[in-house]
C-alpha cells in the first residue's frame, strides 16, 4: 500500500456504532428561549431503554446518523444537535413515554414550515428501534415565529372587512359535493346566502372537474354573491377553492377570484402542501383576500393515538404558514374531537398567549408575539339542535358551518339558512342575557321555533339525529 493511501490506526477518529444516549440524551440541559421544543409520544421496541429511544428521536431528527462519521469533526455538534432533555412515562400505558426534545433554532430555515416538518417529522418516524412515534406538541419560540407572516389578515381584520360583530359567523358547504353543474351550484349558493348565511363553501374536493370547471363555478358564484348582497344588505362570501395541481394554476385561480371582487378563497393545505399554502397566504395578504383552509387528509396523520402527530401541531403549523379559517372539529358532530383537547388547539389558533395545560393536551406555553389569529371552523354533522352547544363551546370568534344541516331542510336551502340564522341569533341573545346554553339550550331553541316556522321544521327533521361514538384520540 502506498504511503498516500495507508491508514494508521493511531490517527483520525474512532469509527463504529455507539449508543445515541451517549451524545443525545442530556437530562442536565437547560432549554433556551430560542429552542424549538417538541413532545414525542415514544413506544420503543422491546428491550430498547426509553433513554435510548428518546435520544434516537433527537439524533435522527437533527444531526445524527446510524454510525460515527469523520465529518462530525468538521462542525460543532454541541451547537447543532437536538437534545432529549426529559422523559416521562405515559400514565396508564405500558412501555410508552413522552420524550422532550430541544432543537437549536439554527437547524431550521426561516419562514419555512416545509423545512421545519422535514426535520422534526421526517425519516425518524420510520426508525426500526421504535414501534410507534407521535408528535404531541411543539413550542415555537418567538424568534422563529417572527420569521413568518402568518394568517393573511386575522380575526379582527376579517370582522372589519365583513362588518359582522358579536356572534359566530355562519357557513354552509354546498352539497352534493360533486356532480352539480356550475349554474345549479351558483343557484344553491344564492339560496343559502339570501336566507341569512354569511358564507357558503366549495367542498374540499371541488377543484376543476369535467362536470364543473373552475372558471364557470367562479362566475356563477360571483353572480350569486352580488345578488344576495343586494337583497340582504349584508356582505357575503363563498370559499372559492383555488387548490390546483400546480402553484401557478392555484395563483391564477386566486387572481380570478380577486378580479371578480370576491372576498375569500380556499385551500386544502395538507394535500396542497405547506409551500403552496404559504405562497397563497402571501398572495392573499398582498391582494386583500381572506383565506379559508380545509384540513383534508389530517386524519391520516393525526387520528391514531400512538403514531403520527396531533392536530394541535398541524394547527400551529397552519397559523405559521397562513390561513384565516381552519376546520377544527365540532365536539358534537360526526367528526372526531374531544371537548377539552379541541378547546386546547382552538385557543392555540385564536389567542396570542397560551399557558401550558396538560389537561387540554397543551404541553408547552406558547407565545405567538402578536401573529394574527385563525378562526376555528366547526363543520361536520351539525344541525340546529347543536347550535347552543356550539355557541357555548366555540364562542363568537368561530365559523359554524352547516352543510346537510342547511341543505337538508325539507323546504329548501333558503329556509334551511333561515333556520340556522334564527337559531344562532336566539342562542347569542340568550347567552348575552345570562342564560346557561349548556343547560337551557333545547328550551332556547324551542322558544325560538315558536315564531320561526323554518326553525320549527328543522327541529322536527333533526330531533333524533345523533353521532355518539367513542373518541379514539384521547389524552
Curated annotation (Swiss-Prot):
Cofactor, free-text remark: Binds 1 Mg(2+) ion per subunit.
Catalytic activity: 2 (2R)-3-phosphoglycerate + 2 H(+) = D-ribulose 1,5-bisphosphate + CO2 + H2O; D-ribulose 1,5-bisphosphate + O2 = 2-phosphoglycolate + (2R)-3-phosphoglycerate + 2 H(+)
Positions of the propeptide removed during maturation: 1-2
Keyword vocabulary terms for this entry: Acetylation, Calvin cycle, Carbon dioxide fixation, Chloroplast, Disulfide bond, Lyase, Magnesium, Metal-binding, Methylation, Monooxygenase, Oxidoreductase, Photorespiration, Photosynthesis, Plastid
BP terms from Gene Ontology: photorespiration; reductive pentose-phosphate cycle
Record's subcellular location: Plastid, Chloroplast
Sequence positions that bind substrate: 123, 173, 177, 295, 327, 379
PROSITE patterns membership: RUBISCO_LARGE (PS00157)
Enzyme Commission code: 4.1.1.39
Residues where Mg(2+) binds: 201, 203-204
Entry annotated with the keyword Oxidoreductase: yes
Residues flagged as site, Transition state stabilizer: 334
Modified residue annotations for N6,N6,N6-trimethyllysine: 14
Function as written in the Swiss-Prot or TrEMBL entry: RuBisCO catalyzes two reactions: the carboxylation of D-ribulose 1,5-bisphosphate, the primary event in carbon dioxide fixation, as well as the oxidative fragmentation of the pentose substrate in the photorespiration process. Both reactions occur simultaneously and in competition at the same active site.
The protein's name: Ribulose bisphosphate carboxylase large chain
Species per Swiss-Prot/TrEMBL record: Chara vulgaris (Common stonewort)
Amino acid at each position: 500500500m502506498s504511503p498516500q493511501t495507508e491508514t494508521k490506526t493511531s490517527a483520525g477518529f474512532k469509527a463504529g456504532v455507539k449508543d445515541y444516549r451517549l451524545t443525545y440524551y442530556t437530562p442536565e440541559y437547560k432549554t433556551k428561549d430560542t429552542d424549538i421544543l417538541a413532545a414525542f409520544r415514544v413506544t420503543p421496541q422491546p428491550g430498547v431503554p426509553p433513554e435510548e429511544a428518546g435520544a434516537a428521536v433527537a439524533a435522527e431528527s437533527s444531526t445524527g446518523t446510524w454510525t460515527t462519521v469523520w465529518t462530525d469533526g468538521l462542525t460543532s455538534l454541541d451547537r447543532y444537535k437536538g437534545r432529549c432533555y426529559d422523559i416521562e412515562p405515559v400514565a396508564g400505558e405500558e412501555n410508552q413515554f413522552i420524550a422532550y426534545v430541544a432543537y437549536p433554532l439554527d437547524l431550521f430555515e426561516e419562514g419555512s414550515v416545509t423545512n421545519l416538518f422535514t426535520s422534526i417529522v421526517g425519516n425518524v418516524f420510520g426508525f426500526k428501534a421504535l414501534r410507534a412515534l407521535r408528535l404531541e406538541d411543539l413550542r415555537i419560540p418567538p424568534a422563529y415565529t417572527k420569521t413568518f407572516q402568518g394568517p393573511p389578515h386575522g380575526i379582527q381584520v376579517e370582522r372589519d372587512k365583513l362588518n359582522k360583530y358579536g356572534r359566530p359567523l355562519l357557513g354552509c358547504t354546498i352539497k352534493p359535493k360533486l356532480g352539480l353543474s356550475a349554474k345549479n351550484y351558483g343557484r344553491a349558493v344564492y339560496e343559502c346566502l339570501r336566507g341569512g348565511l354569511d358564507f357558503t363553501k366549495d367542498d374540499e374536493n371541488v377543484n376543476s372537474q369535467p362536470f364543473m370547471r373552475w372558471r364557470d363555478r367562479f362566475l356563477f358564484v360571483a353572480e350569486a354573491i352580488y345578488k344576495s348582497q343586494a337583497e340582504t344588505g349584508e356582505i357575503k362570501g363563498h370559499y372559492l377553492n383555488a387548490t390546483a395541481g400546480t402553484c401557478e394554476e392555484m395563483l391564477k385561480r386566486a387572481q380570478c377570484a380577486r378580479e371578480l371582487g370576491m372576498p375569500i378563497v380556499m385551500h386544502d393545505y395538507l394535500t396542497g402542501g405547506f409551500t403552496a399554502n404559504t405562497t397563497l397566504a402571501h398572495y392573499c395578504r398582498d391582494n386583500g383576500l381572506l383565506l379559508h383552509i380545509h384540513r383534508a387528509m389530517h386524519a391520516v396523520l393525526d387520528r391514531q393515538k400512538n403514531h403520527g402527530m396531533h392536530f394541535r401541531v398541524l394547527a400551529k403549523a397552519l397559523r405559521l404558514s397562513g390561513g384565516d379559517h381552519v376546520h377544527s372539529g365540532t365536539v358534537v358532530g360526526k367528526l372526531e374531537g374531544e371537548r377539552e383537547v379541541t378547546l386546547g388547539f382552538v385557543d392555540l389558533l385564536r389567542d396570542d398567549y397560551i399557558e401550558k395545560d396538560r389537561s387540554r393536551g397543551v404541553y408547552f406555553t406558547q407565545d405567538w408575539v402578536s401573529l394574527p389569529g385563525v378562526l376555528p371552523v366547526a363543520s361536520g354533522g351539525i344541525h340546529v339542535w347543536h347550535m347552543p352547544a356550539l355557541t357555548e363551546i366555540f364562542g363568537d370568534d368561530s365559523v359554524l358551518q352547516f352543510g346537510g344541516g342547511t341543505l337538508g331542510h325539507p323546504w329548501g336551502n333558503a329556509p334551511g339558512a333561515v333556520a340556522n340564522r334564527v337559531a344562532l341569533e336566539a342562542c347569542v341573545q340568550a347567552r348575552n342575557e345570562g342564560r346557561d346554553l349548556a343547560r337551557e339550550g333545547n328550551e332556547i331553541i324551542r322558544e325560538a321555533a315558536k315564531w320561526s316556522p323554518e326553525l320549527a321544521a328543522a327541529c322536527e327533521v333533526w330531533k333524533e339525529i345523533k353521532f355518539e361514538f367513542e373518541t379514539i384520540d384521547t389524552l
